[in-house]
Amino acid sequence: QDLPHVDPATDPTAQALKYSEDAANADRAAAARPGKPPEEQFCHNCQFVLADSGEWRPCSLFPGKAVHETGWCASWTLKAG
């Protein structure tokens, strides 16, 4: 089942967390999170993403919606393991 994609233009949570579908366009350096260098932080290696594969994946920060695998937000946290 395809979940609706998080829309950073209209989603208040996405705006608060500075979510971007393309991490290259996000200000990762200014909001640097521990675990990996900012340029290696993506939704696909974040603990909040709930799938191990797929271009669009469910995220626990956006219930019922999907984030892009190469996206990023200010809550990025390195996936354990």
Curated annotation (Swiss-Prot):
Cellular compartment(s): Periplasm
GO function term, MF aspect, one: 4 iron, 4 sulfur cluster binding
Keyword Iron: yes
UniProtKB keywords: 4Fe-4S, Electron transport, Iron, Iron-sulfur, Metal-binding, Periplasm, Transport
Domain of life: Bacteria
Classification via PROSITE patterns: HIPIP
Pfam families (alphabetical): HIPIP
GO CC field: periplasmic space
Binding, [4Fe-4S] cluster: C43, C46, C59, C73
Membrane-traversing stretches: none
Function: Specific class of high-redox-potential 4Fe-4S ferredoxins. Functions in anaerobic electron transport in most purple and in some other photosynthetic bacteria and in at least one genus (Paracoccus) of halophilic, denitrifying bacteria.
Family, per entry: Belongs to the high-potential iron-sulfur protein (HiPIP) family.
Subunit description: Homodimer.
Protein name stated in the entry: High-potential iron-sulfur protein
